[in-house]
Amino acid sequence: IDMEYASAAKAGIDVRFEAKATRLLTDDRGRVTGLLVRTPEGTETINAGAVVLAAGGFGGNPEMRTRYLGANWELARVRGTPYNTGDGIRMALDVGALPWGHWSGCHSVQWDLNAPWHGDRKVGDNFQKHSYPLGLMVNVKGERFVDEGADFRNYTYVKFGRTVIGQPRRTA
């Protein structure tokens, strides 16, 4: 990481820690001119010729998951990081950016009901986060709700994740 800091310093980029961006600033024409940040010392305005929003998606935000993915998604466990809260997306939308792309789709997989709410960021087999067991899947009512043999597992596991979350108690 030292090389990245050196490259940033050489390019005149100021790297800050404990500075949470809270709002994009714009001029009268709507061009982004900087941002507002919150630090332990208070709020600060940073003027900039360019702002890069590299803040991840909204997978760690239950409200945004429900808004864009649908019912029951606020209850989904997050396979990855809890820090992708959609703040960068929200800031862009707040200043007039247009949502573009496929917001109603996601990479969803079945996951152990007792797994942690967010990914443990360790590789291991404690909780299988990428698959489902071979066999029949039934919901809590004992009803079969998918054709487990519709295709190879690599082509069905994401599709089945969305199907499971629509079942009673989002459980199979």
Question: Predicted regions: what is each one?
Answer:
Residues E18-K20, L35-P40, G49-A50, A54-F58, ...:
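Fold-independent oxyanion-binding glycine-rich loops
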Residues I1-G49, I89, V95:
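Helical element adjacent to the flavin cofactor pocket in flavoenzyme catalytic cores
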Residues I89-A172:
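An anion/pyrophosphate-binding glycine-rich loop and adjacent beta-alpha core
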Residues I1-R23, E63, A71, G135-R144, ...:
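Conserved N-terminal/central alpha/beta ligand/cofactor-binding core
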Residues D27-G30, V52, M64, G70, ...:
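A generic structural micro-environment signature
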Residues R38-T39, I46-P116, T156:
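Glycine-rich loop(s) and the adjacent beta-strand/alpha-helix scaffold that form part
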Residues T39-P40, G80, V123, H130:
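Generic detector of short alpha-helix boundary/capping microenvironments
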